[in-house]
């Protein structure tokens, strides 16, 4: 949280750009402008020490960025707010179920990939409370009528989640159930209120699934899981906060060289064999493609797949299927470069995990989002 605040402070440089219509956290219509141009919120921001409830309200007022410059939906701070570090009893107000033109494409580069601070994760380290705010948990309605969270994904704009096709269709429907919900802004799945020391996060946003779109080329009968990528449309828009933000898609011209640093994150199995209730992160290297092909001879990997990991106790296995393989650009922006697809065992030395390459599906992602946002 305080890493978020440091980021927020360092971002305070003058922002030129046309204002846009927006809705404040209290429901009033206003304009999306630079924080410097919004006197009420700037005055609140100048308080020292900065109260936790003010930090939370500023975060919920953010409506985009210009580079690293935050823009806010300008309006007065509510006269009475409970100054508490606990999560509010209600989740941040979610957006309308109406169709918004800006939801027809992934979030623009100046509004995504900014970190405010196994398929399960092995050897991972615990994330900060507000780290990787685009992470999503996919929930399924089981035959017993309960909700089971079995896959991961990432938020790419207010309305859409990027995940794996095998998290949407095929065997998972029989083994687990029907995809019905997405949870955003989660940190510790065992706690109703996520706190580190005296700082607490907002309540996670639980949003119903409207529709899901596995890639048409995917079949769970194919052992190599080619085209293992999918899009989930939310029934209502996610509200951007410090704890919920979209990630950028990798440029389709970008290269990932062997040995490049990439990251996975999720709530997966740790070395003691148990799922982690707390969001973990893990740094992995891109694995040599030819060596990876040799390891997976029976699967015939294609050019649309990436191999990463292969270091003992450091890999992703089933619990975070559909979760992201990510990299940080030199200017500090996070991009999703891959989607967790499959692997053999967990954290086996010399055996990398296999990920669907996002760069090879940019056109399909954009077209699917545009055609379904109606």
UniProtKB/Swiss-Prot annotation:
UniProt keywords, alphabetically: Calcium, Disulfide bond, Hydrolase, Metal-binding, Protease, Secreted, Serine protease, Signal, Zymogen
Activity: how regulated: Inhibited by aprotenin. Not inhibited by EDTA, PMSF or leupeptin.
Chain sites annotated for binding Ca(2+): 186, 194
Tissues of expression: Expressed in hemocytes.
Induction data: Upon physical injury. Up-regulated 5-fold after 6 hours and 15-fold after 18 hours of injury.
SUPFAM superfamilies: Trypsin-like serine proteases (SSF50494)
Keyword Hydrolase: yes
All residue ranges annotated as the Clip domain in the record: 21-74
GO biological process, one term: zymogen activation
EC number: 3.4.21.-
Major localisation: secreted
Family per record: Belongs to the peptidase S1 family. CLIP subfamily.
Domain remark in the UniProt entry: The clip domain consists of 35-55 residues which are 'knitted' together usually by 3 conserved disulfide bonds forming a clip-like compact structure.
Protein name per its UniProtKB record: Phenoloxidase-activating enzyme 1
Gene: PPAE1
């Amino acid at each position: 949280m305080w890493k978020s605040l440091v980021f927020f402070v360092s971002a305070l440089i003058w922002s030129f750009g046309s204002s846009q219509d927006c809705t404040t956290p209290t429901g009033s219509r206003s304009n999306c402008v630079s924080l410097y141009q919004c006197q009420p919120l700037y005055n609140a921001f100048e308080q020292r020490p900065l109260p936790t409830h003010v930090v939370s309200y500023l975060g919920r007022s953010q409506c985009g960025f210009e580079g690293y410059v935050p823009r806010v939906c300008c309006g007065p701070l509510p006269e009475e707010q409970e100054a508490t570090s606990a999560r509010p009893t209600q989740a941040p107000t979610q957006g309308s179920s109406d169709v918004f033109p800006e939801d027809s494409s992934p979030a623009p580069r100046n509004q995504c990939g900014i970190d405010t601070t196994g398929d399960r994760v092995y050897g991972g380290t615990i994330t900060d409370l507000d780290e990787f705010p685009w992470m999503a948990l996919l929930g399924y309605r089981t035959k017993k009528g309960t909700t089971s969270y079995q896959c991961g994904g990432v938020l790419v704009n207010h309305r859409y989640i990027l995940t794996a096709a095998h998290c949407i269709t095929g065997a998972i429907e029989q083994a687990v159930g029907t995809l019905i919900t997405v949870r955003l802004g989660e940190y510790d799945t065992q706690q109703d209120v996520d706190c580190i020391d005296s700082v607490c996060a907002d309540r996670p946003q639980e949003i119903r699934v409207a529709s899901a779109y596995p890639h048409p080329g995917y079949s769970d009968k194919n052992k190599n899981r080619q085209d293992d990528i999918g899009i989930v449309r939310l029934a209502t828009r996610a509200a951007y906060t410090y704890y919920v933000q979209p990630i950028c898609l990798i440029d389709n011209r970008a290269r990932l060289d062997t040995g490049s640093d990439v990251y996975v994150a999720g709530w997966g199995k740790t070395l003691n064999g148990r799922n982690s209730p707390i969001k973990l992160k893990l740094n992995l290297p891109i694995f040599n493609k030819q060596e990876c092909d040799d390891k997976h001879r029976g699967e015939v990997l294609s050019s649309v797949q990436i191999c990463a990991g292969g270091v003992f106790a450091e890999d992703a296995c089933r619990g975070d299927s559909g979760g992201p393989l990510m990299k940080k650009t030199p200017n500090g922006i996070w991009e999703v470069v891959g989607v967790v697809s499959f692997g053999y065992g967990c954290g086996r030395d010399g055996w990398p995990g296999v990920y669907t390459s996002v760069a090879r599906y940019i056109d399909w992602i954009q077209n699917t989002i545009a055609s379904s946002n109606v």
